[in-house]
Structure formats: C-alpha cells, structure tokens
Swiss-Prot record:
InterPro entries, sorted: AceGlu_kinase-like_sf (IPR036393), AcgluKinase_fam (IPR004662), ArgB (IPR037528), Asp/Glu/Uridylate_kinase (IPR001048), Glu/AcGlu_kinase (IPR001057), NAGK-C (IPR041727)
Keyword field contains Amino-acid biosynthesis: yes
Catalytic activity, reaction form: N-acetyl-L-glutamate + ATP = N-acetyl-L-glutamyl 5-phosphate + ADP
EC number: 2.7.2.8
Main subcellular location: cytoplasm
Gene: argB
Official protein name in the record: Acetylglutamate kinase
Pathway: Amino-acid biosynthesis; L-arginine biosynthesis; N(2)-acetyl-L-ornithine from L-glutamate: step 2/4
Length: 283
C-alpha cells in the first residue's frame, strides 16, 4: 500500500512538469556509451516514448557511436586527425552516412516501434535539414554547419511519430559532409526554439573541480559558465559541448541540460522531478 501511495504522490508532483512541457519541443542528443549498452538504450527510448505520450514534441538527434569506426575498419579506410578532427575524404563521408543513416538511425526507429511507439528516421541531408560547407581544405569533407532548415522536423512533429535525426550535413553543391553531432543537435534545438535541449553524455554533468563530487554543479547561467571556462575549470572534453549549447541559446533555445545517459530513466528524473539529475544551463 505504501509503495502505491508513493507512486501516486510522485505522479501528482510531476503534474506541474507535464503541464510545463506539454506542446513544447525537447531536443535530445543521444550518443556515447549510452548507444552501446542495450539496457541503457532501451531505458532512454522508453523515457522518450513517455515524453511523447504526455504531449511533448521530442526530437532525437544521434551520432554514429562506434558504428562509423567499425565500418571504416571493415573497408580498410584509415582515419587521420588534424587538431582532433577526422580528415574525411569523399569515401569516408559516404561510409559515415551509411553507418549513421543506414545502420544507427534505422536501428533506433526499429527499437522505438518495437517498444510500442512510432518514429520516422531522416538524416541531415533530407530536405537540406543540416546545410554545411567545408570547414577547411585540410579536412576535406568535414563540414561547418551554415544553416538549419527544420521544416521536415516540424512536419513530423504534427504526427504521432518521434523524429530521429542522423547528424550528417549537405552542401549547396550536393556534397555530403561529416558534421559534429553535438553541434548539429544544438543548432537544431536553436532553430526550433526548443524549450529544452538535453545532451546525454557519459558523465553526470559539470564540475567545478572534476571529478570531485562535492564540486558538482546542478545549475549555472551563461555568465558564470563563461567564468568557469576562462578559469579552465571545465574539462577539455566538455568545451565543444559548452560552445554548442551557448550558440543554440543565443539562437533561441530556452534551457540546456548536460545529463549522464547511463543513469536509468535519467530523462524522466531530470524533466519531471524538483531535484533534477544533471547540470542545467540557463540564460
């Protein structure tokens, strides 16, 4: 009886959050180890289906996880890096698209349908969703995002399906470009003026002195975040994610959250409880 009462109390407390996010857009960037562990993946997808069921416009943007590396290895395509970015020739760009849009994207759509929901998978090249140009001559087909055309997402959001977006870009010349998935997701969130952008990663969130748990930051604004970056208290691994979030917030994004995707039902705990789960970044 007590467990039932606790469940009822939790649902009652969550009501204000159901109302807050109903008919609002929440963009979720999915990647990292959360894509590898099947139990974690199923937990995340179940959470996404619940969000959709209570009237939230969920947009799922994903990277390639290990799938791109595995396909490149299969075709004996060696990777070279310049300043941390993969040099991408035309063949590598095509293989990356195959892994992203062919394997990972359709697998996620299949899993969502298997769990009782509906999903439509597209890549960034469909409808020129993610428009890009070469970031530099040295990196060949590595793309810099120049524009987001979200109309295809908005049309899907008018249905019962979750839009599942593979983060590839296309140029006005029709060439395919490899784009950073975190940047793509944040730019999509900004273009949609999303209420919330959730970036799933492999850490709990931001720390003032990583990995000291006592220094965990549960909420921070852009001004104080800039101070932490200048003081070099944010790990190098997090800097690209922070830069992507900042850009999206200037574009129209409401809030962003860095969240550990490995925690069971982290999405529900973040969106529907007072305490939250990760680090919230606001204006």
């Amino acid at each position: 009886m007590r467990d039932s009462q606790n469940t009822a109390q939790t649902l009652t407390e969550s009501l204000k959050y159901f109302l807050k996010y109903r008919d609002q857009t929440v963009v979720i960037k999915y990647g990292g180890n959360a894509m590898i562990d099947e139990k974690v993946k199923e937990s995340i997808l179940k959470d996404i289906l619940l969000l959709k069921t209570v009237g939230i416009k969920v947009v799922l943007v994903h990277g390639g996880g290990p799938a791109i590396g595995e396909l490149l290895e299969k075709y004996e395509q060696k990777s070279q890096f310049v300043q941390g970015l993969r040099v991408t020739d035309k063949k590598t760009a095509q293989l990356a698209l195959t892994a992203l849009a062919g394997k990972v994207n359709k697998s996620l759509v299949q899993d969502i349908i298997r769990l009782g929901g509906n999903a439509i998978g597209v890549s960034g090249i469909d409808g020129k969703l993610i428009e890009a140009k070469p970031i530099s001559e040295d990196l060949d087909y590595v793309g810099e995002i120049t524009a987001i055309h979200p109309e295809i997402i908005e049309r899907i959001n008018q249905t019962d399906a979750v839009p599942v977006i593979a983060s590839a870009g296309i140029g006005l010349d029709g060439e395919i470009y490899n784009v950073n998935a975190d940047t793509a997701a944040s730019r999509i969130a900004g273009a949609l003026s999303a209420e919330q952008f959730i970036l799933l990663s492999d850490v709990r969130g931001l720390y003032g002195n990583f990995p000291d748990e006592e220094s965990f930051i549960d909420e921070i604004n852009l001004t104080n975040l800039e101070k932490l970056v200048k003081e070099k208290k944010i790990t190098d691994r997090m800097i690209p994610k922070i830069e992507a979030i900042k850009y999206a917030m200037f574009e129209g994004l409401g809030q962003a959250v860095l969240l550990d995707g490995r925690v069971p039902h982290a999405l529900l705990l973040e969106l529907f409880t007072d305490k939250g789960q990760g680090t919230m970044i606001n204006h």
